[in-house]
Amino acid sequence: MSITITLRKWQAEAVKRSDHLSNGIFLEALGGRGKTICALAISKHKKAKKIIITNNRLSILNGWIDAVKFMNFDKDVEIIIQTDRYLQNKVKKGHKLDCDVLIVDEWQNMSSDKQVALYRKIKRKYTIGLSATPIRKKGQNFYPLEKTVFGWATPNNKFDWQKTHGKMVYDPFSYSKEKWEDFRNYESYISNLPNFFRWEDIEKIENATENNGFETKFYPVTVKAGNPEKLAEFRQLNLVTVGD
């Protein structure tokens, strides 16, 4: 059976934004908005022949396996869905990792120094970062976010980046005698990132009257479903439309 998925309006907009002159895109969408399907749609749009998807939880990765089935990728597309620990072990054993698109799911849990070091060793053409709540360490994990998703940070040096964007406070135990307390101006900072799709913008699109992506509501079934397995998958992935 051939399946066609109708993207939500914000997802279609994200696919368009992936054409920007940037090495990647970050999707800060709330839970249930369809980040998984959107990331796969962008990968398809990029005509990726090899995709690596990583998260640190197997339960989350199992959801990706289910979503991939809906996207009708060509048979010659290789999709690797693995934990960061598995990929780190591959690198330790001397394997070279490469792909067309790297998808890092749940950035807030995937931005440790060890994980970021792994991303540097994965040769790729494009990166997609996903999270509903990306901020950790009071925002300090946005420096590796820039480096990982966009290929560089502004400024590119970590110390200069912190001085530029951070509200620094005195710390007698630090070499520089100061430490990061919080963003100096988060709104200004985030608005200048190369390709960061903010949740506020996504919600505006989702709640627009002309949007086809209203929150999906399932009403009591009055007729027995002809294909209950497909209906269950439809609900799990929170799809707008699935057609033959």
Language-model features and meaning:
Residues 48-51, 58-79, 149-152:
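Conserved helix-turn-beta segment of the N-terminal RecA-like "Helicase ATP-binding" lobe
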Residues 105-107:
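Walker B catalytic acidic pair
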Residues 4-21:
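N-terminal pre-P-loop "Q-motif" helix
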Residues 204-244:
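Conserved helicase/translocase motor-coupling segment
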